[in-house]
Design a protein with these regions (language model features):
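Sec-dependent bacterial lipoprotein signal peptides
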Residues: 1-20
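Membrane-embedded alpha-helical bundles of multi-pass integral membrane proteins
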Residues: 64, 73, 369-372, 394, ...
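Short cysteine/histidine-rich metal-coordination sites, predominantly Zn2+-binding motifs
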Residues: 34, 80-93, 312-318, 332-338, ...
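Low-complexity, acidic Ser/Thr/Pro/Gly-rich terminal tails and inter-domain linkers that flank the onset
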Residues: 83-104, 443-469
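Extended surface/linker regions that mediate inter-domain or inter-protein docking
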Residues: 107-382, 467-769, 774-780
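Repeat-solenoid scaffold signature
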Residues: 399-431, 471, 477, 481-484, ...
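A eukaryote-biased signal for short, well-structured alpha-helical docking elements
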Residues: 60-88, 415-452
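Collagen/collagen-like triple-helix recognition
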Residues: 21-63, 71-77
Length: 817
C-alpha cells in the first residue's frame, strides 16, 4: 500500500514539472529532417527577351599583315594604288570643239573649244549637252594656278581616193621638215628655268619660223580660243615648192591635245571651210571612222601615246600616208596592222622604235572586227570589208602570207597600189566564196570555231550522292541549235552518235566531253581524291557515260568516293568540245575543228543542303576584251560567260585544276625545264599574274612548253580592274574580290614533295605573298626577275610583315593562330 502511494506521488510530481515547462523559453531548433522526394517538373516558363548582341569574337590571327598598310583606306591601300588612274597616271577629260571660224582673204582659222573634266567619260565619249554635278567645264589646269595651259593643234584634210582600189585619206597641213607636226600654244605664266616658254614649239617647213599661235579666254569656265599662226592657204608640200595644198571644198579635221600632265584630253571637229574670199564659220560634217577609240581601249584600257594622245581621230591627223621614217611608213593603217600582226606573220616592220615581231597579239589576227567595231554603237565600221585596199591588205598580206595554203604569190596576179581589190574581193559577186573579205577572214579555224560554239550548250541536270563516302553521280545533256538559238535549243545525242560532232572521239580526236569534280568551293584543293598534284576527278562522258535514248541525257558516276570528313560544297563542271568540219578552210574542209563550247559548273552540297556558286573574282567579259573568246587546253576549257545567275561569268573550271596544291612537275622533263627549274606553281592567282607580267614558263599537256617570258601586256599591269570585278569602267575605287578568309589560309605550292598524291610535304609560299610577289618580285615564286635587288627588297619587306616561303601547310597553320 505504501509503495503504491509513492508511485502515485512520483507521477504527480513529474506531471507537475511538465506542466510548469510550457511557460518556459523556447528551446533550440532540432536538426533538419531528411530531404523529401523530388517533386514533378513544373511547366516551361515563357521565353525571355533577346539579350543585347555581344562583341564579335576574335578571328584567327593571320601571320601576313599586308592589310595593316595595304588595306582599304590605309596609307598604301591596294585599291588606291592599283587602279587605272594610279597605274596609268591618267586623269582623263574631254575637249569639245564648238566651232571653227575663218577670216576672209586668209586661212588662219580660230578654233573655239571647251575643256570638260575630269570625270566626263573615257576618250571618244561625246561631251554632255549640259553640265552636271560630276561633269562640268574646267579651267585647265586649275590645280597649279596656271591660267593658260599649253595645247597642241593639228589640222588635216580628207583627200579623195586616188583610184578605185583605194580609200580617202588624211593629208596634214602642218609640217616640220617632212614630218607632220602640230602648232602649239604657250600658256601665260608657264616658263622653264631658262625663262623661255615651256612649249617646245616646232618649226614650219613653209616659213621656217616657230609655229606658236595665240591662245585666249573669251569668258566662261573652261572656254578657250586659239588663233592659228599658219596660213593654211600658204602651205606647200613637204620638201617641194609645189603650190598650196589647201582645199576648202574638202572635209577638214581640227584636232586638239592637252599639252601637260594635268589632264589628258583630245578633241576633234570635222568641218567644210568656207571659200577663202568669203570667210566665216566652217560647216560641221560627220566622217565615219575606220576604227573607234573605244575598240582600242577594250584591250589597251586607256591608250596615251606620245604622252597624251588618246583619241584615234586625233592620231590620223599626223599618221597619214605622208609620214615616213627610216624607210618605213607611219601611215595609221600600215603601222597598226603591222604591229598587231607582226609576231604571227613574222613581218619585218619597225616604226618609232617599236619592232613588230616583239609584239604578242592575244588572239587570231584574222579577227578584223576586234578593232573595226564601235562598242555600244549601232553604227557598223565596215570599211575593212566593203572597201578593201592594197595598202590595208598588204600591210598584213605580204610575201608568202597571201595565196595558197602553202604560201605563195597573190593568186590573182600582180597587184599595185592602183589595183581595185573590190573587183574580186567583194561580198556580192566575189571571184570565189572565200574571195569575199569577210568570209575569207571568218574562215580561219579559230574564228569559225568561235562562231560555231554558239550552237551548243552544256547542261548539268542533277548531281547526287555527294555526301562523304558516296560516289557522285552526274546527269547531263548537250543542247543544240543550228543557228545559235534562233531555233530553240534541244537535247542532242552524245553517246553512241555517228557521223556528227561527237563522233570524233578516238584518243586525241576532235570530240571530247568530260565531267570534272573538285572540292571544296571556298578554295579548291581536291585533297583525298587520289589524283596526282591536287587535280579533280575526271569522268569520260563519251566512253563511260550511260545514255538515255529518249531525252539524250547521259549519266556518269565517279569511281572515287567523296573523302570522309569532307564538309562544305563541291563543284561539278562539264568541259570539252565537239568536232565540226570547217567547209571554208583550205586546211580543214573535212577534218573536224575543235569547237570551244562554254563550260558550265554546278555546286553540290557535301554537308548540309545549301549550295552557292564559287565566289566571282575576275570578270570573264574583261578576259575576252583582249582574248576575244578565251579557250584553252585545246578548246576544252572555255570559261562560263556572264549570265543572269553569273553576272561576271566564272573561271571555276580553271581554278579546279589550277589550285594551291598544283605545280607542273608531272609535265616537266626530269632534268628540268628550259628555265632551269624542276617545277612551277600553276596556282591560278599566281600563274595568271605572272603570265601577264611576262615572267614565267609553264609546262603543259604532253610536255608542251609555254614560255610566257616575252608576253607584251597591252594595258597597265598595275591596273587590277583590267581583269578583276569592279563597279564601273573607270573602276575607282577598285573592288577586290579575293578577300582574306577568317580561316586558315592555304599557301601556294611551289614545290611538290615526294608524295605526288598527298600534300602534307608540299612546300609553299603564304597566300598574300604568292599573289603580290608574282608581280612585285619574282625571285621566290618565279625565278626570272630582271631586277634581283628590287625583288630581294620586296621579298624582305613581305617576310618582315609575316610572309613565309618554303613552308608546309602545317607550318603556315601554326603561324596563323
Amino acid at each position: 500500500m505504501r509503495t503504491s502511494k509513492l508511485m502515485t506521488l512520483s507521477v504527480l510530481v513529474a506531471t507537475g514539472l511538465g506542466l510548469a515547462a510550457c511557460s518556459g523559453d523556447t528551446g533550440p531548433a532540432g536538426a533538419n529532417g531528411a530531404t523529401g522526394a523530388t517533386g514533378a517538373t513544373g511547366a516551361t516558363g515563357a521565353t525571355g527577351a533577346t539579350g543585347a548582341t555581344g562583341p564579335a569574337g576574335q578571328l584567327p590571327q593571320q601571320a601576313e599583315q599586308c592589310t595593316v598598310c595595304h588595306g582599304a583606306g590605309r596609307l598604301a591601300g591596294a585599291a588606291e594604288i592599283h587602279n587605272l588612274r594610279a597605274s596609268a597616271d591618267l586623269t582623263s577629260g574631254l575637249i569639245q570643239i564648238t566651232g571653227v571660224t575663218f577670216p576672209d582673204g586668209t586661212v588662219t582659222p580660230t578654233v573655239n573649244f571647251t575643256v570638260w573634266g575630269p570625270d566626263c567619260g573615257t576618250p571618244g565619249t561625246a561631251a554632255p549637252s549640259s553640265p552636271t554635278d560630276t561633269c562640268k567645264p574646267v579651267d585647265f589646269p586649275a590645280v597649279n594656278s596656271q591660267p593658260l595651259p599649253a595645247f597642241n593643234f593639228t589640222v588635216a584634210k580628207l583627200a579623195p581616193a586616188p583610184s578605185a582600189g583605194s580609200n580617202p585619206f588624211w593629208v596634214p597641213y602642218l609640217y616640220g621638215n617632212t614630218t607632220p607636226v602640230a602648232e602649239r600654244s604657250c600658256g601665260s605664266g608657264i616658263v622653264t628655268s631658262t625663262g623661255l616658254p615651256d612649249c617646245s614649239p616646232t618649226t614650219s617647213s613653209t616659213t621656217g619660223t616657230q609655229i606658236v599661235g595665240t591662245l585666249t579666254r573669251p569668258g566662261g569656265v573652261g572656254n578657250y580660243s586659239y588663233l592659228f599662226k599658219t596660213n593654211l592657204a600658204a602651205v606647200t608640200r613637204p620638201g617641194t615648192t609645189t603650190p598650196s595644198i589647201y582645199d576648202p571644198t574638202l572635209t577638214t579635221r581640227f584636232g586638239i591635245q592637252t599639252g601637260n600632265d594635268q589632264l589628258f584630253a583630245n578633241g576633234t571637229l570635222d568641218v567644210v571651210p568656207p571659200a577663202v574670199a568669203v570667210g566665216g564659220p566652217g560647216a560641221p560634217t560627220t566622217t565615219t571612222p575606220i576604227v573607234a577609240t573605244q575598240a582600242c581601249n577594250q584591250c589597251h584600257q586607256r591608250l596615251a601615246i606620245h604622252g597624251r594622245r588618246v583619241l584615234e581621230a586625233y592620231c590620223v591627223t599626223c599618221h597619214a600616208p605622208a609620214l615616213v621614217e627610216g624607210g618605213q611608213s607611219g601611215n595609221m593603217v600600215v603601222m597598226i596592222h603591222s604591229w598587231h600582226a607582226g609576231r604571227q606573220l613574222d613581218l619585218n616592220y619597225s616604226f618609232a622604235g617599236v619592232v613588230a615581231t616583239e609584239i604578242t597579239y592575244p588572239q587570231d589576227v584574222a579577227n578584223c572586227t576586234t578593232c573595226h567595231q564601235a562598242p555600244g554603237s549601232s553604227t557598223p565600221l565596215n570599211a575593212w570589208q566593203d572597201n578593201p585596199s592594197f595598202t590595208a591588205c598588204f600591210s598584213c598580206h605580204v610575201g608568202g602570207n597571201v595565196g595558197a595554203a602553202a604560201g605563195g604569190p597573190h593568186q590573182g596576179g600582180t597587184v599595185t597600189a592602183a589595183s581595185n581589190c573590190k573587183v574580186c574581193h567583194n561580198s556580192t559577186t566575189p571571184l570565189t566564196p572565200k574571195a569575199d573579205v569577210k568570209v575569207a577572214h571568218n574562215s580561219a579555224d579559230s574564228i569559225f570555231a568561235t562562231a560555231t560554239a554558239k550552237n551548243f550548250q552544256y547542261q548539268i541536270v542533277t548531281v547526287t550522292n555527294t555526301a562523304p563516302g558516296q560516289k557522285p553521280t552526274v546527269k547531263l545533256q548537250v543542247l543544240f541549235s543550228p543557228n545559235g538559238g534562233t531555233t530553240a535549243f534541244a537535247p542532242m545525242q552524245v553517246v553512241g552518235a555517228t557521223g556528227g560532232p561527237w563522233s570524233f572521239n578516238t584518243p586525241g580526236g576532235a570530240s571530247r566531253l568530260f565531267v570534272d569534280i573538285g572540292w571544296q568551293n571556298t578554295d579548291f584543293r581536291n585533297v583525298g581524291d587520289a589524283v596526282a598534284v591536287g587535280q579533280p576527278i575526271s569522268l569520260d562522258v563519251l566512253n563511260t557515260g550511260v545514255a538515255n535514248t529518249t531525252d539524250f541525257s547521259v549519266v556518269v558516276t565517279s569511281t572515287t568516293a567523296v573523302p570522309a570528313g569532307l564538309t562544305g560544297q563541291l563543284t561539278v563542271a562539264i568541259e570539252g568540245h565537239p568536232g565540226v568540219p570547217n567547209p571554208l578552210s583550205s586546211a580543214s574542209p573535212t577534218t573536224a575543228v575543235r569547237i570551244p563550247v562554254k563550260n558550265v559548273t554546278k555546286a553540290a552540297a557535301v554537308s548540309g543542303t545549301s549550295t552557292t556558286a564559287r565566289r566571282a573574282v575576275v570578270d570573264v567579259a574583261k578576259c575576252n576584251r583582249c582574248h576575244e573568246d578565251l579557250s584553252l587546253h585545246g578548246n576544252n576549257r572555255t570559261p562560263e560567260p556572264p549570265s543572269v545567275s553569273l553576272p561576271f561569268g566564272s573561271v571555276a573550271v580553271c581554278a579546279m585544276c589550277h589550285n594551291t596544291e598544283a605545280t607542273d612537275v608531272s609535265r616537266r622533263p626530269a632534268a628540268g625545264g628550259i628555265d632551269g627549274k624542276s617545277q612551277e606553281t600553276i596556282d591560278f592567282k599566281a600563274m595568271i599574274h605572272a603570265i601577264h607580267s611576262a615572267q614565267v614558263v609553264i609546262y603543259g599537256f604532253g610536255g608542251s612548253v609555254n614560255d610566257f617570258r616575252d608576253v607584251t601586256f597591252p594595258g597597265y599591269p598595275a591596273n587590277c580592274q583590267g581583269c578583276h570585278i569592279s563597279p564601273d569602267p573607270d573602276d575607282f575605287p577598285v573592288v577586290f574580290t579575293y578577300a582574306q578568309p577568317p580561316v586558315a589560309s592555304f599557301g601556294t605550292t611551289t614545290s611538290v614533295g615526294a608524295d605526288l598524291v598527298g600534300n602534307t610535304d608540299n612546300l609553299r609560299t603564304t597566300k598574300w605573298a604568292s599573289v603580290c610577289l608574282s608581280c612585285h618580285a619574282s625571285t621566290s615564286l618565279f625565278n626570272t626577275t630582271t631586277d634581283p635587288a628590287r625583288a630581294a627588297r620586296n621579298i624582305d619587306h613581305a617576310s618582315t610583315n609575316g610572309a613565309g616561303f618554303g613552308l608546309t601547310q602545317a607550318q603556315i597553320d601554326a603561324l596563323n593562330k
